[in-house]
Regions:
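Extreme N-terminal starter segment of soluble prokaryotic enzymes
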Residues: 1-3
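Residues that flank catalytic or metal-binding motifs in active/ligand-binding sites
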Residues: 6-8, 82
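Metallo-beta-lactamase
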Residues: 84-109
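Pre-active-site segment of Zn-dependent metallo-hydrolases
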Residues: 17-62, 73-78
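Active-site environment of divalent metal-dependent phosphoester hydrolases
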Residues: 8-11, 26-28, 66-71, 93-96
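Hydrophobic beta-strand segments of well-ordered beta-sheets in folded domains
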Residues: 58-61, 83-87
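Active-site beta-strand termini and strand-to-loop segments that position acidic
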Residues: 12-16
């Protein structure tokens, strides 16, 4: 199953795993609240949180880059991070991975 979450976000679910891509779910928007999701999608954030909490599947979240409309740290902090494996591209600087490591997830690669 593939579900569009708005903006650049997708949820992909198989029999064994769940993969989230660039989940931007915060009600506060991004860039000092000058950008908002259209249409609004923050109500899906609770659904995703429930899926993560209730599943025994392996969970991966892919963060494509550090812009706040792709790397929604306030929302990520609301998730059960000890169950989540984060995947990031190799960047010249390690800002995304560094922030993710501080959240104490299951893994960051």
């Amino acid at each position: 199953m593939i579900k569009f979450l708005g903006h650049a976000g997708f949820l992909y679910e198989t029999n064994n795993e769940i993969i989230l891509m660039d989940p931007w779910m915060s009600k506060e928007g991004a860039f000092d609240s000058s950008w908002y999701q259209f249409p609004s999608n923050h109500d899906l954030g609770d659904d995703i949180r429930d899926i993560i909490t209730d599943t025994n599947k392996e969970i991966y979240i892919y963060i494509s880059h550090e812009h706040k409309d792709h790397f929604d740290v306030p929302y990520l902090r609301t998730l059960e991070l000890s169950k989540i494996n984060f995947i990031t591209p190799k960047f010249r600087r390690d800002h995304v991975a560094s922030v993710l490591h501080k959240l104490n997830p299951k893994s960051v690669t």
